[in-house]
Each structure stands twice: as C-alpha cells, then as structure tokens.
C-alpha cells in the first residue's frame, strides 16, 4: 500500500482534482482507471459504468480507460454479437459524455485476457464506426504476449486507415507488455 499510495486516489475526491491539476501544470495527462477486475453481477457492472460516466463529467479528467469485462457481467461466449450489442448499449453513454467537451475526453478500451481480445476489437471497431462517434479520437490496448496480437494490430491499423479516409478521427493503439506473462 505504501509503494502505490501516490498512484491510487478516490475517483470523486479533492485529492484526485489536485493530482490532475498538478499533472496538467507539469504538462502531463493521466490515464484514469477505476480499480477492480471483471465484475460478477449486473449491479456491480452498472455501478462501475455509472462511476466511470461521473468521472468523465469531471472537466479535469481528460483520459480514462475501461474494460468490456467491467461494464457487463457474465458475457456469453456463444453469443459474441449479442454481447457486442449489449456492450455498445452500455458504452455509448460514456462515449457521448466524452464528446460533450472540447477537446473531447479520451477513452481507452482496455482488455486483459485472451478470451476478450476478439470481442474487444469487434466492439471497439463497431462502436467507433457509428456515425455519431466518427469524430471521436479513442484508443484500444493490445497485450503483446497474446498469440493473436500481431493480426489484431493489422486489423486495427486497417480500420484506422479506412476511418481516416472517411474523414474520421484517428485512433490510438497502445501495445503493452501485459501483466499476465505466466
């Protein structure tokens, strides 16, 4: 706790605003992510979603990360498109919240497990292909250690190119080492 206490803050507190102001004054932008792993129930998922939406309403918050597994409980592995539709319904309000400001707040779609890779990419590309989000710059995280990451990167690069050709905003692809190198 001592080692990371300077990195963990209450998402609604004055300490967060002080840290965000300090970072901005030093030329930094902080990526905020509510703590917690995959949610176990719908009440927890809706709570996480609402807390993220409220966080994005803070004018000092310019960058936030969210995982599909944190906003929708018990995704059905046999109904990928159904999962994606449910997730898009849940995430649209967050992306709309991000677009209310100028410049827009940045939302980074994160994922941690291999089982979420293809769903997350499909969710990200479908959501950002919707007309209302064409001008929203957003990002996605790829775990470098996953066997399908290179192909996923190529898919996302093609999507980004086609999106720009249609007049859309750019996307950011963040490649990370990954925490699960076991």
Name these PLM-found stretches.
Residues 1-182:
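Positively charged, amphipathic and often flexible ligand-engagement surfaces
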